[in-house]
């Protein structure tokens, strides 16, 4: 079936070993990269066209170790140095922010003197004026979910070149534009969600279709990410003899996460009670992280993945209904320091070890998995890598929560565009890590992307003197935090989308059923319950559909932003290309998903929980996607450019 080849393709020397031994093999390989790279003389020829290497007697200095920094040729095969990829990516992303990001801000118009929705509608719950760093922390930790780790590693079966190109082009010209555009449109429209903006500029019918689409999409996110988190927190793993063995890393990371939630609430209360400067807040946050980390390592909490499903759902309920300042904002603020530590660990690990990209550069336009299923570069690559390139979910965060806390319009570029390019950098680091541990040009088989990424970065941290147990627990905690911080945001957004879907628009008192459906507690329970049912099939069976729906959402949001920009007399032509590409990609992907599920039932291998649920959701997404796209495009064509209130 469509998408399965991506997760199954690839083989390696570590295949066949017990799970923990495979992880330790990767860690030993990464840990030894630095010393191996510094002492090894390459007998392959240096490509003269890339004279970039330096030489120095001190071989310990990472840039000067008698090593060509761009390409080496071994047995006629050219291998790229990961340091060059990292430097090119960093330069491209920084250039995109400084040049294209500022161009968009200047073209659309920023008014630093305007009162933002956070002040106009301040209520202490959703509308809360916050500092630039606090809003950035919320935006980044919410959007930097499992995607920038999961997507590039799964898509690496096509080769590192197409993955890198899509990350950079998508991140700068697709994803960051959408994130910033959604934040901009929402702030200019009283902090309204994309659905309500569609109602204002396109019509109520378009808003209803879009709200339903968004709600269905949040169910997929809840299902996929809950399954990932519960699997990561699983306190048990299969031993070689088939019995259950204790998984300390997962159990300790789970305890830290639970303590982390309590610490976030304490931190939120302290922020509410005392006016802390940014420096004091940062020190307090890092101190709390250290205490929670130390306690969690001493008190591992052993539960099964099924039990963790219920714990995660209980947390999501609380996060969905509590005031922003009490849980989500402080949690995201604390999480950002941890994620930045992870990114810096990976960044400096690549900087000092600069391993070769052992992945093949390009494996062709079609790859075949071990089971014989085929995945095509188009559209698979573009829906497998969502977060890190372009993700419709980001627009829901931008317009659903971040826009209500921006205290100055000039912060929007840093929050919207800046958070996205940082996430793209995380995607590039994920690609480099899987490239470093690849064997014979292929992705290590038998391990999840999270396990590959965690083991790789933990190996880098060990080479810097961090104890093995601490490095592994820290990375397990980080990758679970990636999914958890997106989960709490999407649970809140899903609840709000459900409420918008049944919002009362008549005069007088709303009927009882409508009051019930717009009640935040009822809406949260319904959303989480259906998300839980979908997660029972495992994230592997939801991911392909999630990616396609995510990208379709991005296409619909880009069209909606274009309508808003045109209606308000702002330039919008720069959105035509990305929205057209995403429409082609997503409809192709979802149609292929439907075909694959139908074939599974025809062959007698399909099950209702997996294939049946996917088929139902996919058909709904196609119908709703067509309705929203047609409605928005008609309005875009018919709208006369003018100057509206916003």
Where are these regions (language model features)?
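Membrane-interface "cap" regions at the ends of multi-pass membrane proteins
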Residues: 78, 95-149, 336, 376, ...
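Extracellular loop-to-transmembrane helix junctions
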Residues: 81-98, 155-186, 195, 254-260, ...
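Flexible loop linkers connecting adjacent transmembrane helices
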Residues: 102-128, 154, 164, 168, ...
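Hydrophobic, membrane-embedded alpha-helices of multi-pass small-molecule transporters
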Residues: 131-147, 305-322, 334, 345-355, ...
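Membrane-helix boundary/coupling elements in multi-pass transport proteins
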Residues: 146-153, 170-178, 182, 186-190, ...
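Loop-to-transmembrane helix boundary motifs in multi-pass membrane proteins
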Residues: 204-219, 418-424, 471, 500-536
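Hydrophobic alpha-helical segments and their helix-loop junctions in multi-pass secondary transporters
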Residues: 268-273, 287-310, 318-320, 325, ...
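Extracellular/periplasmic helix-exit of transmembrane alpha-helices
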Residues: 350-367, 421-456, 489
